[in-house]
């Protein structure tokens, strides 16, 4: 039996960990150097609830320079991973300010998984010191959950691509959301207006 194909698009601020998350999931290796993404695609196979799913992973650039280019990734999306970084409260603030309006405009009715990346930095001393200088602290799990409720996300997950903690679970939840979303709808997905 042929695998079910689903398209996943990952969005979020620049440097919040989107590409690392995709690379660790699809290639099982952590890239140590940061290279801003323009557009990359990966394919990964995942089995969820006894179903074989071929997940097309569409990486996007978070930097504002790409705001006009990014919508080219959105057509026919089955699920969105909307990311912020646990060591950056500002990236969480951009979820309702920037990312939710953009995604809901181009991808109405597509399920969103809110993902807190860089979970390993929540208790990292250096990270806490740097944030304290700006009177900030790492994002708490309940703040992530509250945000997921606020934006009407399908679910909230936290992970660390560096330690691989929670990575597989993020994509399992995303795949389940993509599979459920198709039921009862002929063809939703994203449209370019």
Curated annotation (Swiss-Prot):
Per UniProt, location of the Glycyl lysine isopeptide (Lys-Gly) (interchain with G-Cter in ubiquitin) cross-link in this chain: 135
Membrane topology: Lipid-anchor
Post-translation changes: Phosphorylation by PRKG1 at Ser-188 inactivates RHOA signaling. Phosphorylation by SLK at Ser-188 in response to AGTR2 activation.
Modified residues (5-glutamyl serotonin): 63
GO MF, one example: G protein activity
Chain ranges for the short sequence motif Effector region as given in the UniProt record: 34-42
Catalysed reactions listed for this entry: GTP + H2O = GDP + phosphate + H(+)
GO biological process, one term: beta selection
Protein name: Transforming protein RhoA
Source organism per UniProt: Rattus norvegicus
Taxonomic lineage from the root: Eukaryota, Metazoa, Chordata, Craniata, Vertebrata
Gene: Rhoa
